[in-house]
């Protein structure tokens, strides 16, 4: 509970449950304190790569992907703090995420569904890349080409490796000045 109080005191309004759903009490506290949740299915397989070897492209893994997404949804669907469903993290993109997205959209019409590796494909409602530079965010906000245009929320940024949170002011300026760039989740809260 103290973590949530500290987050609220520091004007944080959203947490991403990464890379799996968390304890039921956490959801209760977020409902109580008004902290938004991006709830994420327990699908994380970046060790398998993002190319042809990705489990996302191997339909024998579809039942496992579907089971994890369905369990997340059924367990958490009645929590008002959840504002976005996430299909997983860094597990490539392919048929398994297309099918889990289709299933989520068939049962859930009120909240968006995101998947970071889907980038600009159809199986995400939000463009949710990680570790984009301020210049990349501005380029997205000001694009004029006929790309798919979705809200941009960084699933991770300001990882403590490297610049250890440097540049927060510049990111905040973009979040506040560009309506399509809606913020992000700092990696990570410990």
What is the predicted function of each stretch?
Residues 4-6, 14-190:
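Substrate-binding/catalytic cleft of secreted carbohydrate-active enzymes
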Residues 1:
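Active-site-adjacent "gating/activation" loops or surface patches in catalytic cores
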Residues 10:
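Metal- or metallocofactor-binding catalytic centers and their adjacent structured scaffolds
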């Amino acid at each position: 509970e103290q973590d949530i109080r500290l987050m609220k005191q520091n004007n944080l309004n959203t947490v991403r449950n990464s890379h799996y759903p968390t304890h039921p009490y956490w959801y209760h506290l977020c409902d109580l304190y008004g902290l938004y949740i991006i709830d994420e299915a327990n699908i994380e397989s970046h060790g398998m790569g993002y190319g042809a070897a990705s489990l996302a492209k191997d339909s024998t893994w579809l039942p496992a992907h579907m089971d994890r997404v369905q369990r997340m949804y059924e367990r958490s669907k009645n929590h008002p703090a959840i504002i976005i469903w996430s299909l997983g993290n860094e597990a490539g993109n392919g048929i398994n995420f297309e099918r889990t997205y289709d299933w989520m959209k068939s049962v859930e019409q009120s909240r968006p569904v995101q998947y970071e590796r889907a980038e600009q494909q159809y199986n995400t409602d939000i463009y949710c890349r990680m570790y984009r530079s301020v210049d990349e965010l501005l380029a997205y906000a000001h694009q004029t080409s006929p790309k798919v245009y979705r809200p941009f929320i960084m699933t991770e940024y300001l990882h403590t490796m490297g610049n250890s949170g440097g540049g927060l002011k510049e990111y905040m300026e973009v979040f506040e000045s560009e309506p399509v760039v809606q913020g992000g989740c700092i990696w990570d809260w410990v």
